[in-house]
């Protein structure tokens, strides 16, 4: 008897699983179960999703997703009744044929209700036989999570996310992450969950580092007058699913790339009292106005302001970070940013460089103190976007930001701390950025 073939085109719509089981297993052998528990999702482009009665591991059922063009297609299952705050691991087996571009074949979470949109498994490309991938995740505040087995990713970093080719999915499993594989420590504001194999320092040393991160968290709140995620703890989580070149991705959880030097950074916290520039930077991002308030059109580049928040915290807490094999403690961080100023604006070169602008903000701090920035950020964070004037370009936003610093200083800080030729170079450099 010929086996039935169930084909789901990308425009089809199915019900969402409402099962309350905390450990989920799916081998795609049963068509009725598939139609009850899984829905298809197509974000863009062409392609086809099929549940096949054979073709999986040991010729069992499987899902096949295929597209000759770059696309983002996935089958999705919503899990409910999960324990809030608990770390789970979803794993699946997949094989690929000519998968190219974007995030390739990938497991990920639907971001609805989550504070992190980028969590994913390792990206798989090319042609390969069956192998396992995994992703660790924490459910939303309702104890829910929607797992996605996909070809391509709905949104992209520099690689565009979307992929082409064919992927087969089988043996999807969700279970609590084991203590054997995941190392966990917790402090007042931070929950740290790392690959156990990468933790090479003692619990006491980890606790000392987390205590420093708590102090930084409090300092960020003192600077901007707000805290993210309604005060919920920030999870720092190792993940295999980040593009090469990305150290980490901000959100909750902060995703720390498993493929970068995790162990050496931890060891530097002991050897050099290095608080970790990259981690402080990502925590700085989650204190942005856009993250806390979903507003803040004045902020033309939060890479600058995440680091500027860090400079405040380093000075307030007496913290140390290292860059280019040099350790900077407290207010000495200005010397690091002066390097970039001297290479660009200070040399008369109109090259867009956020670190150079950062140096000019620290010059303002040297003259007026941090209080003017504390007051300026409070004024800015109190505004929603409808209360802001129309800002045409990044230079307008730069001046708008400094107008609030001037209001706090009761003096025009642009006039007192910038030379006209500097402003001309800054304007030109920001115009160059707008045309990139």
Tell what function each PLM region has.
Residues 19-43, 173, 180:
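Extracellular carbohydrate-recognition regions
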Residues 26-30, 63, 75-103, 133-139, ...:
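Extra-cytoplasmic beta-strand recognition segments
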Residues 30-62:
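Extracellular glycan-recognition surfaces and repeat-rich motifs
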Residues 105-107, 132-172:
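Extracellular beta-strand ligand-recognition surfaces/modules
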Residues 113-145:
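Extracellular carbohydrate recognition and processing domains
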Residues 184-286, 290:
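Juxtacatalytic substrate-recognition/specificity segment
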Residues 220, 332-425:
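Active-site-proximal alpha-helical
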Residues 263-329:
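Zinc-dependent metallopeptidase catalytic helix centered on the HExxH motif
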